[in-house]
Design a protein with these regions (language model features):
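Secondary-structure boundary elements
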Residues: 60-124, 173, 182, 187, ...
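Hydrophobic/aromatic-rich core segments of domains that either
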Residues: 132-217
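N-terminal accessory/pre-domain segments preceding catalytic cores
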Residues: 1-87, 173, 208-217
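Catalytic cysteine-centered active-site loop
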Residues: 107-110, 116, 126-127, 148-157
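Short secondary-structure boundary segments
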Residues: 25-49, 100-116, 120, 130
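Active-site nucleophilic cysteine motif
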Residues: 89-93, 126-141
């Protein structure tokens, strides 16, 4: 799998996670020479053995960018302060985003390649695209020490973003959050929010065949 990132030229430190597990990663840096043409400026390889498989999904990175002082982190702390377990915390964060955020159709129609969410601005506006929803929830859950993957792939034929969460005692739960004692319900915060949890939307998001993962951040 090839992950492509835009590098800033402002001298700002950024984090790019190695999310495909243990192994050897090829790292290449390309410089824009003119127009859409690029030349390779640097290459190396990195062999990684994780001391903890969750580490890439517990810290900020370029796509899930937050600090201890972020408003998103403060909101997560407020939502989770009386929650006793990971599942309760995940449910609280999910319900907050689904019930308070609206989908930004204008932004979706004009967003440019290379767009990166500003989680605090999204939280303040209470609206965004699927990438924004997933980034805000990922930041909130990671700040609560709950491993969370921001996943990019396809929902049907639509390029889309959602989250996978690790629940203590259960393991990685792909695209899901709610357990009613028998079944998990898929967690796709964008569709659930825009569809107001209608029967047709819930039927769609609970069908795993509608989703195809490409990248995890």
């Amino acid at each position: 799998t090839t992950y492509t990132y835009d590098l800033n030229n402002a001298g700002t430190t950024e984090t790019f996670p190695l999310t495909e597990g243990d192994g050897t990663y090829a790292v290449k840096v390309f410089e824009n020479t003119s127009g859409t043409k690029y030349a390779q400026a640097y290459s190396t390889s990195v062999t990684m053995t994780l001391r903890n498989d969750f580490l890439p999904f517990l810290y900020p990175n370029q796509f899930v960018n937050y600090t201890s002082g972020s408003q998103t982190v403060s909101m997560a702390a407020e939502l989770c302060k009386d929650k006793s377990g990971d599942l309760d915390k995940v449910t609280a964060v999910f319900d907050y985003v689904v019930d308070h955020f609206t989908y930004d159709y204008d932004k979706a129609a004009t967003v440019q390649s290379g767009y990166l969410p500003d989680v605090d601005k999204v939280l303040e506006a209470k609206k965004g695209i699927c990438f924004d929803y997933a980034a805000v929830m990922s930041a909130m859950l990671r700040s609560q020490n709950i491993p969370c993957k921001l996943v990019v792939g396809y929902a049907g034929e639509i390029y889309h973003a959602w989250i996978n969460v690790y629940i203590e005692g259960v393991g990685w739960v792909d695209r899901v959050i709610y357990f009613d004692g028998e079944n998990w319900t898929l967690m796709d915060p964008t569709f659930t929010s825009t569809g107001k949890r209608s029967n047709s939307i819930m039927k769609y998001v609970t069908d795993e065949s509608n989703y195809s993962q490409k990248y995890a951040y």
